[in-house]
Amino acid sequence: MKVKEETLKNLGDGVVLRPVDHCSSIWSMKMNMKNFLKKLHISPNQSDEAEGSISTTKSNHHKSIDVSSSSSPRSHHSNSPEIKPFSGLSNWLSSVGHRKIPSPPNSFNAKNRAATVDDTVVVNGSEHVDLGSKDPAVEEENQIQLALELSAREDPEATQIEAIKQFSLGSCAPENSPAELIAYRYWNYNCLGYDDKILDGFYDLYGVLNASSAERIPPLLDLQGTPVSDGVTWEAVLVNRSGDSNLLRLEQMALDIAAKSRSVSSSGFVNSELVRKLAILVGDYMGGPVVHPESMLRAWRSLSYSLKATLGSMVLPLGSLTIGLARHRALLFKVLCDSVGVPCRIVKGQQYTGSEDVAMNFIKADDGREYIVDLMGDPGTLIPADAAGLQIDYDESAYSASPGDNDSIHVASSSNGIESSYEENTEFRTGEHRSSTKSSGERNQSGGGGDLIVHPNISREDVKNQKKVEKAPFQNLSSRPIHSFTHMRSPSWTEGVSSPAAQRMKVKDVSQYMIDAAKENPRLAQKLHDVLLESGVVAPPNLFSEVYPQQLEATVESKNSTEAKKERGKDLETTQEGRHQNGFGPVRFLPPLPRVQSKTNAHDQRDNGKVVSQSDSSHSEASSTEYARTVPAAVAAAAVVASSMVAAAAAKSANSDSSPIELPAAAAATATAAAVVATAAAVSRQLELGSNSDGDDGSGGHEPQGSGDSNHGPNSGGERISDKSIGNESSKSDCDDVSDCEILWEEITVGERIGLGSYGEVYRGDWHGTEVAVKKFLDQDLTGEALEEFRSEVRIMKKLRHPNIVLFMGAVTRPPNLSIVTEFLPRGSLYRLIHRPNNQLDERRRLRMALDAARGMNYLHSCNPMIVHRDLKSPNLLVDKNWVVKVCDFGLSRMKHSTYLSSKSTAGTAEWMAPEVLRNEPADEKCDVYSYGVILWELFTLQQPWGKMNPMQVVGAVGFQHRRLDIPDFVDPAIADLISKCWQTDSKLRPSFAEIMASLKRLQKPVTGSNIPRPVPSSSSLPTEHEQKD
């Protein structure tokens, strides 16, 4: 039987279906549809509830939210309007072909859709059949209708697959506005990317609505219709410029700021200064800097109650919030950035920030780097995203269901979030976005929208015309943020991954110590920013495989400085590796293991030491030196620039009778981050000659041992200050190579992995019958100049010989097996020996260990050029089979990926760092003395320094609150006095290692007291332990 050629129309959808002329076709489609419905697990007589209901049904993957208790499911009387068994599904299927991605819940625009649904469908031109009936014939007609809709698609099979996927995801109707789509994405995924623009109609819903597991955001109309009540546990903020004059005024102010910012942008693009001004505008409008979180929280609650009572709605206009918490400020900042065309990303929630009620903004400044914008503690401060990657396991019980209660926990921690990324000159990765640092011209074409060229007469329309707001489509499941995986760093190379106990540490407020310090020091946030900015610099483009050649042109200065640097490499005869270059720990991101976002932080603290040069070269220009004095921190991403600046400063210093030049922190930080590209090629050649003068010191007393463990300290091998070479001798190093210390990878038998460090893995190995430790770098893509600098470091390390320095045996200098081979020390690190449960170290042995460490450090400080460790800590002191302590990780600190705030291991780095280093102030070799004082404290208290604090808290306590570890009464007074001297705030008052050695030797012979108090965890009173004989 043929079906008449007429249109079958679904009145709820308005979809016109094509006629089918043959029974066989109809029957085939009916059978296919039945199979399709079976796949969807939908029975033919199943009916849907009204889509306009606020209480939505539970789905597999999402949580539903009950907004109003007054709404209820629609009754199913025959004379009541209702959604027919398949009309809703048909509507949904018909939209699949037009929709690329999931959309918000089908509760949106429910009222409009319900009005268009009719109770009947025309069949054969005359019959009106109630779709709610149980008539099999009607059910078959419905199946035919669905099959016909599918057949109208270009690719029915692909459409079915997409339909099943979307249905399982609980997708929504296609009639939603772009603003609703973005609101749903922000609510569901907790983040909006650089491409996502906040439009009128966007609303941010926060709070616990019900315990259902379905994930459907309620429509705005339902939220606005909810009566004001103290019992409501959610809040909503609406962006609606047409009804929010305050928001319009703020946007106009932002446009005015953008117009004026052109004068401070040398490249013509919006720079970080504009971002700071926008942040200040947001902070000032929403209550100013947060000094007392409790007061801010009380003010917010008072304003919230007042607005709800005045407006008679639970939905508050964004512009009406003159007091704002972190999530409100972040939303306003994102809106203002969108209005002026500044790329901005916003994230919120536990996954990104460590708290459900905190939101943060990320921007890409004119240097191509990504920064977290502080809108709370010190509005306008930019913190590099890679330097805030602190990882903490939060106590879930600390967060209550009420948004008001949640507010009290992290009200002032918007910039202290836990989400970290590694963009820099590498690729930034989150689950939804991956960006690379590009040149200024390229950023205009990037996904983030790029920088906006601002003209003095800029207006709102100009901005809109120049940067059209694109309707952000719903991304697929890959847009869900990928959970961050941190490459764990152990205190010692031989100790493996960090202990679970440290990772289980619960912290209610990651920034509590910083907040306390801020009360005493209003400039704390800015200072902290400087510290983090220092530590988050990344290596130059040609260093890693993830970086592409075109990124080398990130700035004009970068390109020019690179050429100048090559020129100096041919002619410059001075060695200018200043102390600040020694920190060159490349803040590299995650190993090429899983390509996930890496969490790192600034471990390398580059000290602004003096640049001393004894050569007579004068090839640098005064202008370069002047640039070195004034270089802004934003240029730190171009590592090559810093090397050129250091060279220029050194050359000028050589021709001047005045005191040596101290470079600014930015130059030091840049050099530090340059992995093994710390200096120019000429410097590498000079270092070879400089090493010859002192390389044999102490060689006779060396005893073979091995250890290759430990995380290489941030500034170790780069600590050379000067070189004695002059004249034509420097050219001889051109022909020098590392062939005499190069080891072929094939000659090494690699065994089990014994450690996981900050820049690689450590394996136990055998080399020609000798037990060795093989430190294999995670970054195997060093080429050209970077590889040459690595070899230069190898040349320096091979010259060091001392009984208390870990023996360097050779290196594999050819990718893909770049490795360092050292002696193997079977007892591992001093840290592990001190803090293991059954410690058998008596006082006499610990005193000898302290003396060993002092001898090793005194040797490094006596080298010419001087070697400053800058990451001296008990995990970097290794113990051989004879209990002799040796210093390690002083030569390859530039290879470090992790930084002092990023460690999740039981021993970070901030715990041992000097306060001036934590504050990003100029530091010299005396910073090692402070670190040694902490090691002394460890040895004679047998406790872990700052064991109950995370690294960020240590930064605040030591660096800004001037706190020191408590020295127990049972510690020998002479030792206690020596520790106190090592911890002097003024580094000039700290003793040298020679003086420390003299003090310890006086204590070595007469050992008084046979009982050693033993520490008890979380107790100030320590029991005693009988002295063990050697």
Curated annotation (Swiss-Prot):
Q: What are the Basic and acidic residues biased-composition ranges?
A: 426-435, 458-471, 560-580
CDD domains for the chain = STKc_MAP3K-like
Q: Where in the cell is it found?
A: Nucleus
Expressed, tissue-wise, as follows: Expressed roots, rosette and cauline leaves, and at lower levels in flowers and siliques.
Residues in domain Protein kinase?
A: 748-1003
Q: Which PROSITE patterns match?
A: PROTEIN_KINASE_ATP, PROTEIN_KINASE_DOM, PROTEIN_KINASE_ST
- Gene Ontology molecular function terms on file: ATP binding; protein serine kinase activity; protein serine/threonine kinase activity; protein serine/threonine/tyrosine kinase activity
Assigned protein family: Belongs to the protein kinase superfamily. Ser/Thr protein kinase family.
Q: What is this protein called?
A: Probable serine/threonine-protein kinase SIS8
